[in-house]
Amino acid sequence: MSQDVFKHLTSKQVQRTRARSFGASFERPLASFLPKKENKNLLSNAARVKLLTFSSSSPYSFSYSPVLSRDANDGYIPLDTSSRANLWESVTDYDLQHANEPLVGNYYISTEALGDGLNRSPFTINPEKRRSLSDISYVPIPHKEHSNWPVHCSSQAIVTTSNTTFSIWSANDYFCLLFGYAGSQLNRHSVFDIFPKSFSSHLSNLIVSFPIDNEHERILFCGDVFPVITVDGVRLMDFWVKEKQGKLIWILEFVEESYIDIKLQDGVAVDERTEQPLTSDLLPSRLPKTWDQRLYLTTKTTEGYYCPSMIYPLSKSSFQYIIFHYAAGLLFINSDFKIISLNEALFESMLGYSDLLTKDISLIFPDFKLVLQQLADSHALDPGRVVSEIHVRHAYRTCTADKMKKADYPYLIHSDGNIIQIDCQIISVSPHSVKSNEPAFGVWLIFDSVDNRASDFVRSMRSSVILEEVVISDESEEEEDLSADEDYVDSEWEVVPHNIASYTTIKELGIGAYGQVKLATYKSNKVHEVILKSISKSRILLDSWMRDKDLGTVPMEISILHFLKAHSHPNIVKMITFFEDNENYYLLTEPQKPGIDLFDYIELKPSISEKESKAIFFQIALAVAHLHSFDIIHRDIKDENVILEGNGCARLIDFGSSSLTKNGPFDTFRGTVGFAAPELLRGEKYLGKEQDIWALGILLYTIVYRENPYYNIEEILDAKLRIPFELSKDNVDLICRMLDRNVHDRITIEETLQHHWFDDIRYLDTSHIRIPLSS
C-alpha cells in the first residue's frame, strides 16, 4: 500500500487533510516513508491488487505504487503531507479528549470502494475534506539551528537533469535559493555540484552503476538520505530520483534534524561553532572514515528519551553528528509476523538496521504480538480496518499492565539496544491469510521529537563553556532607514510610516523562505490595518531583481505591484507602498476584511453551487486576463492566493513568483508543484501565460470537485484527467481545455473568458460579481 493511501486512511477527523504554505499547523511530509524495496518472491500478484498497485491509467480511485525499488517501472514520486502525531502528549489527557471516539475508524479497503468513480478519496473519514499534492509542509529553512518555519512556494527542491551527463536542465526557485544558483546559469552546473566532493564521487559511481534505460521508467532512489552543500553549509536531505525518457527528475527535501559540526584537534572532538570540546560521552570510540561506514546510533535527551542519530564524515578530520527529529515508516508483515515489504533507507536511518526484510517484527517491536492479540480480542482487526495510534497505545498499556514496562508508549529497539518511543497505527489487510507472500497487516511507525526537544538537547550537549550570545531586543529599531525621508501619503490611507518600528503586529500570517507576512497596524493610528510582508534581501534570487525606471533596482514583486497600482483591477490586490532597511524590503498591501481565502472557503463549505463556482472563477480569470494584457505572469495561482471578501469580490494576491514575459523563456519554475504544468516538470523552457492557464484549470477543478486532479508528479505528467461527475458540459469542457497537456493547444485567457460557460454572467457588472456566500 502506498504511504499516501495509508496516511489518508488513518488521518484523524479533527485534523485537516491539507497543509498550508503559510500559517499552517506544524505538519511533516510523509514523502520519505514509501516502502522502497520488496522481495519479488514474497508479494504475490493478488497481494499487489490488495495493496492498491494500479497503473496511472487505472480507472480506480487511487493510482499509487506501494513499493518503490530501483528496478521498479511503476513507482510514483510522493508529493503529499501527513499530520504529525504528538508522541509526547499525555496518554491520559488524550484519552479524555477522545473518550467518545469508536475503537476503530470506519474505513475499509475494498475493490468496491476503489472502483467508486464518484469519490476520489473513499477512505477519508470526512469525505468533504480534500487532499492535495500542493500541500506545503513545515521544514527547516537552511540554517545552523533547526527551525519550524514553513517554506513558501515549495518545501521540495526539484531539478531535472540528463541521465547521462547529469547536467541541470531546469529547476524550481527553491532549488536555486538553497544552492545559490541563478536560473539563467543552471545549465552550467551538474547536479553533482551540490554534493560534498568526497560524497559526489560515491554517488556518481552509484548512479552510473545503474544501466541507462531510456525506454522505461524506474525509481533510482526513494527516501535515501544524502549530504548536500547549501548556501548555509552542509545539510542532509531526503532524495527521490526517477528516470524517465532520458532524464532524471530529482526531488529533495530537508531532513528534520539538529546537528553539530565536529572537527578533531589533536585527537579531541571539538564543536566547530563554539570551538569548545564536546562531552566525552557524546561520541563513539571509533568514528567513520567513509560514507559507507556512517554510524547509526541513538542519543539520550535530557528528559531521558532516545532519538535516532547518525554520524558521518565530511573529511578526514571533520564530521557531522545528526539527531533526527522525526521519522515514520510503513512496513507490511505476513501472518507469521515476517516483514515482507518496507523502505529500507528509512528504517536504516530510524533504527540502524539495513537487513530487516524477512525478519520477524519482534526484532524491532518486541510487544507487537501482545498488542495485536489485545486488539484482536477487542474485534478491532476486521479486514480493511485501521486502528489509530491512541487505541494502539491503549492496547499496549493493557497488555503490559502486569509486567515491568520499559516505556509509557509503544517502543522500538534500535540496533544499538536502546529503545525509541513511538506511535503506531495498524491496518488489517488479510489477517487470516496463511500465505507467506501475502501481507496480513500494515504497520505505520511514527517517531516524533516534538517541540524541538532534540534541538534543545544539542545545545545542552555542548561543553559548559559556551560563548554568550548578545541578544538585541529590537534590532529593527536600531537599523538605518534607507527609504525616502518623508512618509508616503495616500489619499485613502493618509500618512503611511516608512519605518518598521512604527508598526505593531496584530497577527502572524506566515513565515516563508523569503520572509514573513503579518497583519499589522500603525502605532500612531491603530484604526488602519495593513498586510505587512517582509522580504529578506539575502534570499532574493538573482533573477528576481528588476530595474524599475521609477523605483530603481527592486524585487520583481514590488516593481509589478507598483505598476499595477497605476493600472489597478478590482480583482487584484492593491499595494499601498513599500520601504526598506539594511536587511529587508517591506511591502504593504490593503487587507481584505472581512474576508477568507479560497482554500478555507472550500474546506468550510459543505458544497459550492455551479453559480457560485462560476462567479468566483470568472473574477480570477478577469484578474489573470488583466495581468496577461500587460505581459505579466503570476506563476503561483492557487486557492490559497485567492481572497474572497465579504461583499463577494474575489482578489488574486501574492505576486512573489510573478514576472514579465519579456524575461522569458524561463527555465526556473516558481510556485506550487501541485499547480505546475507538465512541461515544467519535464524540464522544458516556458513562456509563462500557458502555465498560468494550467494553474487556472487546476484551480477550477479544485473549486468544483474539492480536490486536486493530480496527486503526484507521475499523474501530472501522464495520467488521464478524471472527471468525478459532470457539473455541466460547458464546465467540463472548459476544465479539459485548460488542462490540455499540449501547450500549443491549451486555451488562452481570452478564449477562457469567451467560453460558453460564462455566457450568463459575462455581461454583468464585472467589477464586483457577487458571490452568494451561502452558509
Swiss-Prot record:
Modification Phosphoserine occurs at: S132, S134
Gene3D superfamilies for this protein: PAS domain (3.30.450.20), Phosphorylase Kinase, domain 1 (3.30.200.20), Transferase(Phosphotransferase) domain 1 (1.10.510.10)
Positions of ATP binding: L509, G510, I511, G512, A513, Y514, G515, Q516, V517, K533
Catalytic activity, reaction form: L-seryl-[protein] + ATP = O-phospho-L-seryl-[protein] + ADP + H(+); L-threonyl-[protein] + ATP = O-phospho-L-threonyl-[protein] + ADP + H(+)
Family: Belongs to the protein kinase superfamily. Ser/Thr protein kinase family.
A single GO molecular function term of this UniProt record: protein serine kinase activity
UniProt keyword annotations, A-Z: ATP-binding, Cytoplasm, Kinase, Nucleotide-binding, Nucleus, Phosphoprotein, Serine/threonine-protein kinase, Transferase
Compartment(s) of residence: Cytoplasm; Nucleus
Enzyme class at the top of the EC tree: transferase
Enzyme Commission no: 2.7.11.1
Cited PANTHER family: MAP/MICROTUBULE AFFINITY-REGULATING KINASE (PTHR24346), PAS DOMAIN-CONTAINING SERINE_THREONINE-PROTEIN KINASE (PTHR24346:SF51)
GO cellular component, one term: cytosol
Annotated transmembrane regions: none
Domain named Protein kinase: residues: 503-758
InterPro entries: Kinase-like_dom_sf (IPR011009), PAS (IPR000014), PAS-like_dom_sf (IPR035965), Prot_kinase_dom (IPR000719), Protein_kinase_ATP_BS (IPR017441), Ser/Thr_kinase_AS (IPR008271)
Residues annotated as catalytic: D636
Source taxon at top rank: Eukaryota
Pfam name, any one: Pkinase
Record GO biological process: intracellular signal transduction; negative regulation of glycogen biosynthetic process; regulation of establishment or maintenance of cell polarity
Protein name: Serine/threonine-protein kinase ppk6
